[in-house]
Amino acid sequence: MNLSIQGELQLFAEELHQHLTPSFLENLARELTFVKRKRKFSGHDLAIICVWVSQRVASDSLVRLCSQLHAVTGTLMSPEGLNKRFNKKAVCFLKHIFSTLLKNKICETSLIPSSSITYFQRIRILDATIFQVPKHLANVYPGSGGCAQTAGIKIQLEYDLHSGQFLNFQVEPGKNNDKTFGTECLATLRPGDLCIRDLGYYSLDDLDQMDQRGVYYISRLKLNNMVYIKNEFPEYFRNGIVKKQSQYIKVDLEHIMNTLKPGQVHEITEAYIGKDKKLFTRVIIYRLTEKQLRERKKKQVYTESKKGITYSEKSKRLAGMNIYVTNTPLEWVPMEQIHDFYSLRWQIEIIFKTWKSLFQIHDWQNIKRERLECHIYGKLIAIFLCSSTMFKMRQLILQKKKRELSEYKAIGMIQDHLYILYQAIQQNTQEITRILIRLFHLLQKNGRKSHRYEKKTVFDILGVVYEYTGLIKQKKIA
């Protein structure tokens, strides 16, 4: 085994071990008064049942959960006794563990080298996933409305594509507005960051704030927003003052769309957006391909029937294009690459897909609130551990083998090893390192990302140098 890989994984093992040992969990349980005196059900037992062993805390029967706990620890509980342990203090305990792991910034050392990092220190991707919860929780977690969405939980996540670090995170009611959380995330911005936002987070004020702070953005523009260019020959009053309504000329976006061929791009380099307060920006218009347009129309039909929304005729006509706004310099990200860069946002959808398809975070029976929340935070701890491990392995496999790791495949394989990782944590960091080395060998053999014909991967877009089918691939930003 390469000593540098072993050394890297040893440091990573120490980070994992620090906040998950039985002694740490027991001390935390007493500190948070989840456990007041020595009793048969400990904080460590709660972590076992919610994080390490059971994948179905919210859907398996209490009898089954008791059986799983007894099989691993020998702790004998009645179903009624276990149900009582799913209380507010148990939720607080698991939530505290998750928050501690987030603050620990385990992924800060998992940075991948790329040409994009020359320009953008962090590529911040923000999105949310939502799922329904039992209807009797509608007063605590009101849903987003629409078909059968009386109660729901929304999980907001912003993470850095370069390192995998979770930057901002929030569990909230399904009805909460995405834009509000997007504005809250401004507090953690640093000069040199690149924020990629979808329409749900669109805010002209937020984009203006980013620009003022030396932060770059790529965002979709809502179709009801106006785009202007400066009028070179404005009208004046007799006293020499410019008539405000003549300072700018409205751009006919539909006309531009109709002049473009499918897949073609057009840029307005010196544009202004906003009706009253105008923001100077680049505007890029991308005409959708026939396939993309069919998919969008299909989605519109689904949205109209599912959420009771009716699109105007103008919106349906303009559905044939994407309009992007960005303050990135033209020489860093040419207009031909804006659509590719914006597509990086879909990486967060892969993460959310693992949450539901692999971890079943959205799977529940008609249970009480505290048990559901224990399920959610237990899953989030497991998800964070698997994601952090995946991003570390992604970095090492690129660094040592020049290969691109599939995030989805890797998280599934790491999840399969979660229980033996738990067993290693009960011992020492050397044992954790041994398991991580096993995982490294497995992932480099079976975890390579599949490439579709003429489809760029994340590494291609970011300008990462890696090997694929015997060739070295390198895509540069400019």
Curated annotation (Swiss-Prot):
This is Transposase for insertion sequence element IS231E. Belongs to the transposase 11 family. One of its GO terms (molecular function) is DNA binding. The keyword DNA-binding applies. Keywords: DNA recombination, DNA-binding, Transposable element, Transposition. Disulfide bonds: none annotated. The lineage of its organism: Bacteria, Bacillati, Bacillota, Bacilli, Bacillales. InterPro entries: RNaseH-like_sf (IPR012337), Transpos_IS4 (IPR047952), Transposase_11 (IPR002559). Signal peptide: none annotated. GO terms for biological process: DNA transposition. Involved in the transposition of the insertion sequence.
